[in-house]
Amino acid sequence: MTAIIPAAGLGTRFLPVTRVVPKEMLPIGSRPALELIVDEARAAGAREIVVVISEGKELVRTYFADAPDVRFVYQREQRGLGHAVLQAAVEDDVLILLGDALVVGCCAAKEMAEFSRRHGGAAVIGCERVPPEKVSRYGIMKLDGERIVDMVEKPSFEEAPSDVAVAGRYLLPAEIFGYLRTQPPGKGGEIQLTDAIRRMLAVREAYAYVYPGRRQDIGNPDGYFAALSAYRAN
């Protein structure tokens, strides 16, 4: 299993700080947030960790220069999450951990890998339950038990099929790269991972795993400070 950490975002919600320090390198306790995510990938059993970065994030490469299991690829254009993942295409099952999504309170990736093994190596998407009034902010799962039937992007409260939302972690088969390569660009010319996964669902089962930890979006100041508080409390 190879881990992919998309970390090419420009961090505009954290300006002017991110002109100097990439958001993924902001400290959580005494360590950069990205290092905690790399450790999560290792704990899940990833043999190699590919970090997708953009120009200007060389500080990230410098920090991990002595980590033999970490390598870097560049996303030269900001064309969506699917496009970022595609830059790191490998012939292996992939664990995708969003670089601005920190999970506090559990090792979500490890638990997802164990869940996948219990289900015959099935694809697994890490999820969280969200309040009904917030479903319009997330990709929401349509489920049959734990099996994913469909994914609905940012539905209204009335249209939401559940309160189970995508939460920054994916464990997918290598064939996802074939779907990404043939995925037509969507809004803004972006290639979205969710669209490719939906196509894959037509031929392959995938499951939602609601992990017990708390996801924090460290890509914005409020989420970052919430992550700091949660990390200290944990």
PLM segments and residue spans:
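Conserved donor-nucleotide/metal-binding helix-loop-beta segment in metal-dependent transferases, i.e.
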Residues: 105-135
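Catalytic-core segments of class I nucleotidyltransferases/pyrophosphorylases
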Residues: 95, 117, 147-234
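A conserved hydrophobic position in a structured secondary element of the catalytic/binding core
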Residues: 55, 104, 143, 171-172, ...
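A structural signal for short hydrophobic beta-strand segments in well-ordered beta-sheet cores
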Residues: 25, 141-143, 208
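Conserved N-terminal catalytic core of the sugar/cofactor nucleotidyltransferase
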Residues: 1-5, 13, 26-27, 31-97, ...
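Ligand/cofactor pocket segment of small-molecule handling proteins
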Residues: 130-133, 137-146, 154
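Short beta-strand segments
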Residues: 6-7, 96-99, 126-129, 210
